[in-house]
UniProtKB/Swiss-Prot annotation:
The lineage of its organism: Bacteria, Pseudomonadati, Pseudomonadota, Betaproteobacteria, Neisseriales. It catalyses: 7-carboxy-7-deazaguanine + NH4(+) + ATP = 7-cyano-7-deazaguanine + ADP + phosphate + H2O + H(+). HAMAP family: QueC (MF_01633). Its cofactor is Zn(2+). Catalyzes the ATP-dependent conversion of 7-carboxy-7-deazaguanine (CDG) to 7-cyano-7-deazaguanine (preQ(0)). It comes from Laribacter hongkongensis (strain HLHK9). ATP binds at L14, S15, G16, G17, Q18, D19, S20, T21, T22, C23, L24. Transmembrane segments: none annotated. It is an enzyme of class 6 (ligase). SUPFAM superfamilies: Adenine nucleotide alpha hydrolases-like. This is 7-cyano-7-deazaguanine synthase. One of its GO terms (molecular function) is ligase activity, forming carbon-nitrogen bonds.
Length: 229
């Protein structure tokens, strides 16, 4: 297996959630060296960063957390504004859910590229997906390929953005997680918009996660761990 791995170094944007955890293990199966980067952007629940720390340690990869307080200062979305409740329906004008953080993926990936550049890392892995996305325009392949071009022009580099989940359903993502050995780490991942442990099971993120595991016919290792199974 090692002989089939790319000899280069990959950087994974790790949120502590299901998708980025799956991508971390996908990268471990394909690259000789893997590091993870997370962002403290004033997100609603610190449990996400705690999950990222735990998962990076389980995977045995170097993990860097970059502080960015800009998003909480901007406000206007339920993931950084404590006064807003997630899942109140799409905005009447933009038709986007209030959990959309404008520019988040663009900023994260640009910062990831800036961190990777002086370290000679050319591969950046992100867990965004177009098929199951919640209407987020920064999860679309054309958006991220345009960003890849901008990064390479702006940094005089040849970086590549890897999006292994882009066209996978949530069920396909669960199956991939099992294939790459991510299931033990998924037992410590966090998805719930409410920040609840155990997860609330009712928010859009919880419903989508449950649907994926159910359609894949695989028990959710997080629920099994919390139930003591």
């Amino acid at each position: 297996m090692d002989s089939l791995r790319d000899p280069e170094h990959a950087l994974v944007v790790l949120s502590g959630g299901q998708d980025s955890t799956t991508c971390l293990y996908w990268a471990l199966s394909r690259f000789a060296q893997v590091s993870a980067i997370s962002f403290d952007y004033g997100q609603r629940h610190r449990v996400e960063l705690d999950a990222a720390r735990t998962i990076a340690a389980m995977a045995g990869v170097g993990h860097t957390i970059i502080p960015i307080n800009t998003f909480s200062a901007l406000g206007g979305n339920a993931l950084t504004d404590q006064q807003m409740s997630p899942d109140t329906g799409p905005d009447a004008e933009t038709l986007l859910p209030n959990t959309f953080v404008p520019g988040r993926n663009l900023v994260f990936l640009t910062f990831a590229a800036a961190w990777a550049w002086p370290r000679g890392i050319r591969h950046i892995v992100t867990g965004v997906a177009q098929t199951d996305y919640s209407g987020y325009p920064d999860c679309r392949e054309n958006t991220l390929r345009a960003l890849e071009l901008a990064i390479n022009l702006g940094m005089e580099s040849r970086m590549r953005l890897h999006m292994p989940l882009m066209f996978l359903s949530k069920a396909d993502t669960v199956t991939l997680a099992r294939t790459v050995g991510a299931m033990p780490a998924l037992a410590f991942s966090h998805t719930c918009y409410a920040g609840a442990v155990p997860p609330c099971g009712q928010c859009a993120a919880c419903v989508l996660r449950a649907k994926g595991f159910a359609e894949a016919g695989i028990p959710d290792p997080l629920l099994n761990r919390l139930a003591g199974v």
